[in-house]
């Protein structure tokens, strides 16, 4: 009641197959699958690049901070 039954879906599927043909539907499915695969690959590469940039910034920041070579005993002797 109000919803789409299995019979209505089957009729729509038959009409689509008759209009486009199985070869064309297969090609559309292949193209769509390739597009989704490419999108996922681009997203994962972008995440890897972002992680690399964060690590690089942390390394540069830690390298830029001066490192003291004096120990506490050296500081006490100077005072």
Swiss-Prot record:
It is a single-pass membrane protein. It is found in: Cell inner membrane. GO terms for biological process: protein transport by the Tat complex. Signal peptide: none annotated. Residues 51-63 have a biased composition (Basic and acidic residues). Keywords: Cell inner membrane, Cell membrane, Membrane, Protein transport, Translocation, Transmembrane, Transmembrane helix, Transport. It comes from the Bacteria. The keyword Acetylation does not apply. One of its GO terms (cellular component) is TAT protein transport complex. InterPro entries: TatA/B/E (IPR003369), TatA/E (IPR006312). The chain crosses the membrane at residues 1-21. Disulfide bonds: none annotated. Residues 45-79 are annotated as: Disordered. One of its GO terms (molecular function) is protein transmembrane transporter activity. NCBIfam families: PRK02958.1, tatAE. Belongs to the TatA/E family. Part of the twin-arginine translocation (Tat) system that transports large folded proteins containing a characteristic twin-arginine motif in their signal peptide across membranes. TatA could form the protein-conducting channel of the Tat system. The Tat system comprises two distinct complexes: a TatABC complex, containing multiple copies of TatA, TatB and TatC subunits, and a separate TatA complex, containing only TatA subunits. Substrates initially bind to the TatABC complex, which probably triggers association of the separate TatA complex to form the active translocon. This is Sec-independent protein translocase protein TatA. It comes from Alteromonas mediterranea (strain DSM 17117 / CIP 110805 / LMG 28347 / Deep ecotype).
């Amino acid at each position: 009641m109000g919803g789409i039954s299995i019979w209505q879906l089957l009729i729509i599927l038959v009409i689509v197959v008759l209009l486009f043909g199985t070869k064309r539907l297969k090609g559309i499915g292949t193209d769509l699958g390739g597009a989704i695969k490419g999108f996922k690959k681009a997203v994962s590469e972008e995440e890897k690049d972002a992680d690399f940039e964060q690590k690089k910034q942390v390394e540069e920041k830690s390298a830029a901070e001066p490192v003291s070579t004096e120990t506490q005993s050296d500081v006490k002797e100077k005072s």
